[in-house]
Amino acid sequence: MKTFKTRMSQAVLTFTATSALAITSAGVAVADDTPDSPSPDASGSVLSGEFVLPGIDVPPFSGESNADGSNPFYVPPETLPEGKGTVIRSQDAPNLLNLESNGGPGSAERILYTTTNEHGEQVATSGAVLKPTGKWQGKGPAPTLVATPGTRGAGDICAPSRSSYQLYGFDDGNGAINLNYEYPFHAAASALGMNVVVVDLIGLGTPGQHTYVNHLEEGTAALDGARAGLSHLGLPEDSPIGFFGYSQGGGASAAAAEQASSYAPELNVKGTFAGAPPADLIEVVDYVDDHAITGVIGFALNGALERHSDLTGLQDEYFNDQGKQFMADTKDRCIGDAVGRWAFTDTRTMTKDGRSFGEIARSDERLSEVLDSYKLANRYKNLNAPMLMVNGKNDDTIPWQQARDTAARYCEAGGTVQFNTDPLPEVLPGFVINHAVPMLTQAGPAMNYLVDRFNDKPAPSNCGKF
């Protein structure tokens, strides 16, 4: 039965990625020559229409493949340059919009840049910068979309920027597979005339463990990614930007939005889309236990141990041999292969006393304090720009209530927030369908929302009504 459920889960992930990639081949609509924002079609999406990607032959495909996941580009110098968001180096990154990476429309480059971790220490992280293929038809200068990735995994090979043609990568050492399933959304923004900066987040691609769903670090990495991207593109630091992310990326975008006024006040943030954010990790851990993506619990715990060495002893204290194997295995897995290895594993089978990881997280003050510090709209609450937050009422991965409560806290702090509920009925709970499908159906309305913010249209808000 578990084998069937695992295969079914992998099929769902494959379908979601394929559906997203179909957006690229189907094309996106580009606004006409008016100063107004693009007109949505009947579905409310700008992600449909007649735009066709450049018709050029794709060279023989080969994803990055390194037995140890290493790549010299991602290894920072021993001494980092001063400043936050300082570009250390760049490298051409051919992609479907410009296979020659010739500096023209649609060309992309990887960047390695500086940021800070939760302890205020300077570290290097990476990302990619994608130039527009279309002309910005809206108000003012072409904006920059800062895209924060949904869950890719914990291994270096899983980083979006490390994928060949910004699509795919493979670690032949452990079989980890990187599928850049959000590339179509980046291509859509490029077609609308936006610059796109895709951040990898700390430890994903670069040395050290990826600090998965550590919102303190995801926020700084995204803000410094904006700084680095603008600098690399030769744009003023007050150029209009917006944050766009779903799932892990939704949490990262929200984290950037709430830290922007204190960490990067010079940035001209126009708006944020935070889709299905894992805002309260202690609530989320119960949802993903005995679930298709149980492996993400390992991603999160390994990330917490990376920053809090005092928690290392928890493994010997609580985990049995299977639990320790789970922790070791998920350190460098990507999400697809983590499903293949750990789908529908009940964490009670991995602890010495039969308690779940969630029960342990609630009862151990050391662990609960760390996870609580990553909670959104907690330490930082003040947004300096409007936000659209969306969560499925029946999302089987990210609880609707914790997202709703997060939006409410932003409202209470004076934020302009539109909180929307995706109405998809419950479908095969635990198989990620109710989490993955809204990523596709809400992408168009989310892009429209940001286009309106870039055009200085009044932002909607339903604070006090949800």
Can you annotate each of these PLM segments?
Residues 30-136:
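Catalytic-loop region of hydrolases
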Residues 41, 46-71, 78, 278-380:
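Accessory cap/linker subdomain of secreted extracellular hydrolases
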Residues 117-126, 130-192:
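Short, surface-exposed "cap/lid" segments of acyl-processing enzymes
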Residues 181-184, 191, 212-233:
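Alpha/beta-hydrolase active-site loop
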Residues 227-297:
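Primarily recognizes the serine-hydrolase "nucleophile elbow" in alpha/beta-hydrolase
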Residues 363-364, 368-370, 394, 411-466:
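C-terminal catalytic histidine-bearing segment of alpha/beta-hydrolase fold enzymes
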Residues 383, 388-395:
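Short beta-strand/loop motif that positions the catalytic acidic residue
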Residues 385-386, 399-409:
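Short alpha-helix in the alpha/beta-hydrolase fold that links the catalytic acid
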